[in-house]
Every structure is written in structure tokens, then in C-alpha cells.
Design a protein with these regions (language model features):
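Long, hydrophobic alpha-helical transmembrane bundles and adjoining juxtamembrane helices/loops
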Residues: 179-191, 235-238, 248, 258
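Cytosolic juxtamembrane amphipathic/interface segments immediately preceding
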Residues: 202-211, 318-324
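Cytosolic juxtamembrane N-terminal segments of multi-pass membrane proteins
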Residues: 191-209, 341, 345-349
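B-type heme-binding environments
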Residues: 2, 34-202
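N-terminal chloroplast transit peptides
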Residues: 1-25, 29
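Alpha-helical bilayer-embedded segments of polytopic membrane proteins, i.e.
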Residues: 210-252, 275-280, 330-345, 356-397
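Transmembrane alpha-helix/helix-exit interface in multi-pass inner-membrane proteins
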Residues: 393-410
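Membrane-embedded catalytic scaffold of the fatty acid hydroxylase/desaturase
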Residues: 3, 244-357, 408-494
């Protein structure tokens, strides 16, 4: 039996969000889900009882929009830190990659992607996510593979279990799991995972991950051209300047996203582009965003779906987290306008993160950016362009995830989770340019280091691969996706 509760799942089962019967079903589902999690916690040795199960604390703040989110640890807390505390009581932090278990205990703090990822993946097969986030092969960088080869090998997670626990957990991820609970350690890649590895190798051999200098130059020139035009118009045509700079900031955000995901000397050299153009810390963003890629739509781990108290993407009775009915009932009306503050909040987190880390390089780049922003531009144009850019990014960046399946546990392998949590947008021309690669979100999530200008050509290849293996490749028009997001917020506003 697997417990995986989400508003979408309840809707699919024919449960309407109103009425006492629906409320009873939601409450029962919430109690069942929390009971499963608490039962699992009792099977893990800990120095003292943990009192921070889901529902006892406010939980993770919104990494995406909340002004209260901390700038460190990718802005993610995990179920009141219960899961993290469970992992830390173990003797080793171990991941399985390509069939081998590696002891990552000593490496966790030095991991460029942050220690939180290794802590949460402890005891799991990380093969697909490792290769997704670290390029390799003829068009990539083998740094991560070389570092991996230097790590000590070890046995599986059963080494750290007591005799009683071993009886409960010995089959997890293979053929059995604790009664009534989802798999905690999913460590057996199936046929689809092997086929996905073959697909990635095919793309590598055929050069899909290589950067095209002409296309790179065209995208960069277009983005900088919008900045130049806005700067030129700032003194005489402030509204046009604000729109031009806002568009430029949106496109610069997409471009910085490409550079940080990408590998090779060009992307490494352009890593600070987001700091210079938008005031974004590459280090802060990378940690936050890699958590999203690794744990897409997994409640308590993916900060991009944890937006309370500003937005409720799930029924509070299901999550067990505090409700705010006064705000929630209006969220479908203020939701989209509030996205305008996305960039302002990302900027705040970026400065706080760079300052806390005493990162002199990033602080210098941020200083150059803010000197230009507030000395070369009128104040109204500077602030207005941040709001325009923030709205254009915020309204699109998570639209393809928020109404898809939200999972309470990491049930399934990396590829399976991406198909369940992601929808693509069917757009062309100017509309595709505005989406900046977010329209091919599933392609991007499966192959994050692939340049976005190759996504549309890769889409039919992946669609065929998915159809042959029974995966649901979801794609809708942008109007349908944005409407679906509005209706989802409205449905949760009226529960």
C-alpha cells in the first residue's frame, strides 16, 4: 500500500473541495499520511524523541516568494527537520550510483551542491540525478565523475540498522516496504531507468549537450540589447524604458539559469552574469534550484511548491501545516499580481547569502550591479523594471509544476518523478521566447545541462521514448496552463 495524497489526487478520485464529506476524507487522508510518517520515524534509532512531526511546526517557509525564508540551505527545511535528524543519527551518509554504494559522510560538507542534498538522498539510488546535474562525456566536464571515483565505497543502508529494524526495512526499494508506508529508500533502478541511461548516452554521442557559439551570441546580444535600449530611453521615455528593462531582466534570468546549469568553459566564465544583470547570487540560486530538480514536487523538500502563507497549493488539512483562511480565500485574485515581487525577494536572498558566506567575488559583482541600477537609472524606472521582470518570470517559472502531482514521499526513481510532476507548454514564436525554455520544462528536468535552444528538437525524441514505456508526457497551451493554475488556487481558496 502506498500513501500519496495531493489535492490533484483527491480531485481525480472525485472528491469535491466543499462539504463535510470531503472534509472528512481529507482529514482521514491527512491522518493516514502523518501516521505513516510517524510510524517510520519510530523505526529509526534517535538519541531522543523528536517532537517536530508535520503539523507541530510551521514547516518550511516559501523559498520562492516568502520574505521570511532563510538564505541558507537552499531555503529548505524538511518536515521540521525530522527527516534530516533521522539521517544524521546514522553512522554513514551513503548514495548508490551505477550500482555501487559510496560513503559520502566526509564529502557532504564539501559538496558544491550543498550537504542537504546528500543528507536527503542518504540510502537512495542517485544515479539518474547525478548524471542529470553533472555533465559528462564528450561535451561535458568529468570533474564530478573523478571526485566520485575518489570516494570510499561501502555497504548499503542495512549496515546501520539494528536486528529489529533490518527485519522491517530489508526489502525497502526492492520488493517490500513497511506495512502501509511508501518506499523510503528506492534503490532498485528498473528497466525504464536503464533505458533512460541509454537515451542520455545517445544524446551525448550525438552532441545535444554542446554549446552553439552563434546561438549563444544571439541570445546574449538580444538580452543586452534590451538593457541598452531601456537605459537609453530611461531619461525621456520612462514607461518604455521600464518595459524594455523588465523584459531584459526576464531574459537575463533565463540566460543566467542556462549558464549555471550548463557545463564547460563558456558557462563557467558566465557564472556571474546573473549577479551583474539582476543582482542574483549564483551560489544561492544553484543550491536552491538543484534541490528543486532533485526533489521535484516532493512536499517538504522542494521549496518551489512551499509557498505558505502567501499561497496554498495543498489543503492545509492534508499537509497538517497552519492555515491562513483570511489570505487563502483571496489567493486566486492576488496570486498573479504578487508574482511581481519575485525578483525583489530573490535579490534579498542573494545579498543575504553572499554576505553570510563572505563571498567577495559575488559581493563585488552585486555592488557593480546596484551601483549601475541606482545611479544610471531614475529610481522609478529601476524599481519598476524589477517588478516587470519579476512578474514575467514568477508567473511562468513554476506554472508547469504547481498543478501537477505533489508527493509526500520520494516514491519512484528520478525519471518517474519528473513525468509525474511536470507539464510542458505548447508555444511558438514570440510566446516561446517569453517562456525562455520553461515551456520545455520536462525536457529540461530530464536533461538540465542541455542548452535550451535544443529542447524543442529533443522533445519529439523524448515523447516517443515516453510513449514506448507508458509515461504520460503532459503538454498544454500556455492559456490552459495559466488557467489551470488560477483554478487550482481558486479551488483551494474555497475549501
Amino acid at each position: 500500500m502506498r500513501v500519496a495524497v495531493s489535492p490533484a489526487g483527491l480531485a481525480a478520485a472525485g472528491v469535491v473541495a466543499r462539504g463535510s464529506a470531503a472534509a472528512q476524507i481529507r482529514r482521514a487522508a491527512a491522518v493516514a499520511a502523518r501516521s505513516v510518517r510517524n510510524d517510520r520515524v519510530r523505526h529509526v534509532a534517535a538519541p531522543a524523541p523528536d517532537t517536530t512531526a508535520r503539523g507541530d511546526v510551521a514547516g518550511p517557509r516559501a523559498a520562492f516568494l516568502s520574505p521570511f525564508a532563510p538564505p541558507d540551505v537552499a531555503d529548505v527545511d524538511v518536515d521540521g527537520s525530522t527527516a534530516v535528524k533521522e539521517k544524521r543519527t546514522k553512522k554513514k551518509l551513503r548514495l548508490r550510483i551505477d550500482g555501487e554504494w559510496y560513503d559520502c559522510t566526509g564529502w557532504a560538507k564539501a559538496h558544491p551542491g550543498g550537504s542537504m542534498f546528500i543528507t536527503l538522498m542518504d540510502g537512495c539510488d542517485a544515479t539518474d540525478v547525478f548524471y542529470a546535474l553533472h555533465s559528462y562525456g564528450p561535451n561535458g566536464d568529468d570533474t564530478a565523475a573523478r571526485r566520485l571515483a575518489m570516494l570510499p565505497k561501502c555497504g548499503g543502508p542495512e549496515e546501520d540498522l539494528t536486528e529489529g529494524e533490518e527485519a522491517v526495512f530489508s526489502g525497502v526499494g526492492r520488493s517490500a516496504s513497511p506495512p502501509g508506508a511508501p518506499h523510503t529508500f528506492d534503490v532498485s533502478p528498473g528497466e525504464a531507468d536503464a533505458a533512460f541511461a541509454d537515451l542520455r548516452k545517445k544524446f551525448e554521442r550525438e552532441g545535444w549537450f554542446a554549446r552553439d557559439p552563434l546561438k549563444e551570441a544571439a541570445v546574449l546580444a538580444t538580452t543586452l540589447g534590451l538593457y541598452g535600449l531601456g537605459w537609453f530611453l530611461a531619461g525621456t521615455h520612462p514607461i518604455l524604458a521600464t518595459l524594455s528593462l523588465g523584459l531584459g531582466m526576464q531574459q537575463a534570468g533565463w540566460l543566467a539559469h542556462d549558464y549555471i546549469h550548463g557545463r564547460g568553459p563558456w558557462c563557467a566564465a558566465m557564472r556571474g552574469f546573473g549577479a551583474l544583470t539582476n543582482g542574483f547570487s549564483a551560489e544561492w540560486w544553484q543550491h536552491k534550484h538543484n534541490m528543486h530538480h532533485s526533489f521535484t514536487n516532493i512536499d517538504g523538500r522542494d521549496g518551489d511548491i512551499k509557498l505558505e502563507p502567501l499561497y496554498f497549493l495543498q489543503d492545509p488539512e492534508v499537509t497538517g501545516r497552519p492555515d491562513n483562511p483570511a489570505m487563502r480565500k483571496w489567493q486566486h485574485w492576488y496570486g498573479y499580481p504578487l508574482y511581481a515581487f519575485t525578483y525583489a525577494l530573490w535579490r534579498r536572498h542573494s545579498v543575504a547569502s553572499a554576505w553570510a558566506r563572505k563571498d567577495k567575488t559575488e559581493l563585488a559583482l552585486l555592488a557593480v550591479h546596484y551601483t549601475w541600477l541606482f545611479t544610471a537609472l531614475p529610481l522609478g524606472v529601476a524599481l519598476g523594471s524589477i517588478l516587470v521582470g519579476g512578474f514575467l518570470v514568477g508567473s511562468l517559472v513554476t506554472a508547469t509544476h504547481q498543478t501537477e502531482e505533489i508527493m509526500f514521499e520520494q516514491n519512484g526513481q528520478f525519471v518517474d518523478i519528473q513525468f509525474r510532476s511536470t507539464r510542458e507548454a505548447d508555444v511558438k514564436g514570440l510566446e516561446a521566447w517569453l517562456w525562455g525554455g520553461m515551456d520545455t520544462q520536462l525536457v529540461h528536468h530530464l536533461f538540465p545541462t542541455m542548452p535550451r535552444y535544443r529542447h524543442h528538437d529533443a522533445r519529439p525524441v523524448i515523447q516517443k521514448w515516453a510513449e514506448e514505456r507508458g509515461y504520460d508526457f503532459r503538454i498544454s497551451t500556455s492559456g490552459e496552463i495559466l488557467g489551470k493554475n488560477f483554478n487550482h488556487l481558486k479551488e483551494l481558496a474555497h475549501i
